[in-house]
Amino acid sequence: MVITLPKLKYALNALSPHISEETLNFHYNKHHAGYVNKLNTLIKDTPFAEKSLLDIVKESSGAIFNNAAQIWNHTFYWDSMGPDCGGEPHGEIKEKIQEDFGSFNNFKEQFSNILCGHFGSGWGWLALNNNNKLVILQTHDAGNPIKDNTGIPILTCDIWEHAYYIDYRNDRASYVKAWWNLVNWNFANENLKKAMKK
């Protein structure tokens, strides 16, 4: 089974001005595509060549895991954002955030602090844990909650420097602030609904 680069659900300029076309082009067509190409090279003629991407993420380690997880994480990140998104949450995710964090503003502040305070490269996640509570998680490098079994991902934000350096240089806080204008709450609601059924 050849791993392919998932198609973006919006144009490269669709997230502008918050994330520029130049950033998205490099991030998607160079970084994300690079992980796909590298993984296919690494798994050729191994048992992983017959497995799905998700199974590779769950079962692998080392370079194979790093590339597989980065493919999965990036696809989830693209889907966590969209044009004409952002603003306040709605539907079940709004109610669940209020239940588990007290208010959307509390959640937004806590999540932003985690994203801005994370040392080095990694990811910030909103996830549903084993007690059916929403939690904020941070993972280093290619890590994710699926591999760590710490929760079911609901949303993610990429905090590797390549996600924001063209647009914001070393100002991660401005990138995080801009990211809130792109959050796809419909995607979060879909993930929450599926996660609550498990």
From Swiss-Prot:
The keyword Protein biosynthesis does not apply. It is found in: Cytoplasm. The keyword Cell division does not apply. Homodimer. The gene is SODB. It is an enzyme of class 1 (oxidoreductase). It comes from the Eukaryota. Coiled coil: none annotated. This is Superoxide dismutase [Fe]. It catalyses: 2 superoxide + 2 H(+) = H2O2 + O2. Destroys superoxide anion radicals which are normally produced within the cells and which are toxic to biological systems. Its main location: cytoplasm. The lineage of its organism: Eukaryota, Sar, Alveolata, Apicomplexa, Aconoidasida. GO terms for molecular function: metal ion binding; superoxide dismutase activity. Fe cation binds at H27, H74, D158, H162. PROSITE patterns: SOD_MN. Its cofactor is Fe cation. Keywords: Cytoplasm, Iron, Metal-binding, Oxidoreductase. Belongs to the iron/manganese superoxide dismutase family. It comes from Plasmodium falciparum (isolate HB3). Binds 1 Fe cation per subunit. One of its GO terms (cellular component) is cytoplasm. Pfam families: Sod_Fe_C, Sod_Fe_N. Its EC number is 1.15.1.1.
